[in-house]
Swiss-Prot record:
EC number: 2.7.14.1
PANTHER family: ARGININE KINASE 1-RELATED, ARGININE OR CREATINE KINASE
Chain positions recorded as ATP binding sites: 27-31, 92, 126, 177-181, 208-213
Phosphagen kinase C-terminal domain: residues covered: 24-255
Keyword annotations: Allosteric enzyme, ATP-binding, Kinase, Nucleotide-binding, Transferase
Family: Belongs to the ATP:guanido phosphotransferase family.
Reaction(s) catalysed by this chain's protein: L-arginyl-[protein] + ATP = N(omega)-phospho-L-arginyl-[protein] + ADP + H(+)
Name of the gene encoding the protein in the UniProt record: mcsB
Protein name: Protein-arginine kinase
Length: 363
């Protein structure tokens, strides 16, 4: 398979589109946790009940079209190869928990990959909508419409006083988890992030790494989400998160301008050194690749680097993960082989960018 063909089939729509404030906010995600009446929750249900739930959703929703999202495909975890599951995690379409710890887990995935419905994870279903940039309200509207459509076919576990019943007490109520993925290199470089994270946590929000709980903030990418849902409306949860995100955007932009003033040519040098490494390296580990990609993305946003797509960070942060590298290679790779393949893939992506620029100039 040619790189261009692999790239075009591997990249989800949200990765290659730009949304509001997409210089800092990479994506907005809404997730709704729901359970079905007459079935025990996943923490207690039997294997037979788990299979019945998968069968219910396969029978009711698989291969049906939904609006502009296209048809739903049902992916059963037991039928996927480890590399295939890893790729789904790397694209943020399923959780590591569903991939690794749910033998009767499944996922309904829309054609455009903006919608995924995890089945038999921590709850019977978890509805997820992903949008580029800062679009929490739009993502909530899309998730709510999908939720209503699903509820037209199944009965949810709902309590008049408590709201939607979920396995984890922190999700009881709306069952809503809203999150944004943010690129905050200047706040990291100026070390302001060290005081900002505890302050955000005190406001009832959670700051995590790229792949959620327990993961590292590779490439200066942070995930900010709400923690509690009981006693708050969906709109209140979104508004609270949106306010904090707007403040973070303002702080990051101010920190970037401060760095330009104080570091000047040193900052520009840092950006171009990282670009040089990515364009020419033959071996690169994931941590170094993530840091270099973050530097290059910052350079694009500051206008140092021209004619390179801003979305290169979104795309390559995912395409250079182990699952994707092995999918591109067509089989399992040892860590040192992945480092060679990662370097080659990054060089190919940058060459593709150059070809697009040349074609644009010729027109």
């Amino acid at each position: 398979m040619s790189f261009e063909k692999f790239f075009n089939t591997a990249v989800s729509a949200w990765m290659s589109q730009e949304g509001p404030d997409s210089d800092i906010v990479l994506s907005s995600r809404i997730r709704l946790a729901r359970n079905i009446v007459d079935f025990r929750f996943p923490t207690l249900f039997s294997s037979e009940e788990a299979m019945q739930i998968v069968a219910l959703f396969e029978r009711t929703f698989a291969y049906r079209s939904y609006g502009g999202a296209g048809r739903f495909e049902l992916l059963k975890m037991s039928e996927l190869q480890p590399i295939e599951k890893r790729v789904l995690v790397e694209k943020h379409l399923i959780s590591p928990h569903l991939a690794e710890d749910s033998p009767f887990g499944a996922c309904l995935l829309s054609e455009n990959e903006e919608i995924s419905i995890m089945i038999n994870e921590e709850d019977h279903i978890r509805i997820q909508c992903l949008f580029p940039g800062l679009q929490l309200a739009e993502a909530l509207e899309a998730a709510s419409e999908l939720d209503d459509w699903i509820e037209g076919h199944v009965n949810y576990a709902f309590d008049e006083r408590l709201g939607y019943l979920t396995s984890c007490p922190t999700n009881v109520g709306t069952g809503l988890r809203a999150s944004v993925m943010m690129h905050l290199p200047a706040l990291v470089l100026t070390q302001q992030i060290n005081r900002i994270i505890p302050a955000i946590n005190q406001l009832g929000l959670v700051v995590r790494g790229t792949y959620g709980e327990g993961s590292e903030a590779l490439g200066n990418i942070f995930q900010i989400s709400n923690q509690l849902t009981l006693g708050k409306s969906e709109e209140d949860i979104i508004a609270d998160l949106h306010t904090i995100v707007q403040q973070l955007i303002a702080q990051e932009r101010a920190a970037r301008q401060a760095l330009v003033k104080t570091l000047g040519i040193q900052l520009e040098d840092k950006v171009f050194r990282s670009y040089g490494i990515l364009a020419n390296c033959r071996v690169i580990e994931s941590k170094e690749a993530a840091q270099c990609l973050s530097d290059v993305r910052l350079g694009i946003d500051l206008g140092y680097i021209k004619n390179v797509s801003r979305n290169i960070l979104n795309e390559l942060m995912i395409l250079t993960q182990p699952g994707f590298l092995q999918q591109y290679a067509g089989g399992a790779l040892r860590p040192e082989e992945r480092d060679v393949r990662r370097a080659a893939l990054i060089r190919e992506r940058l060459k593709m960018e150059e070809r697009r620029k040349m074609e644009g100039d010729e027109r």
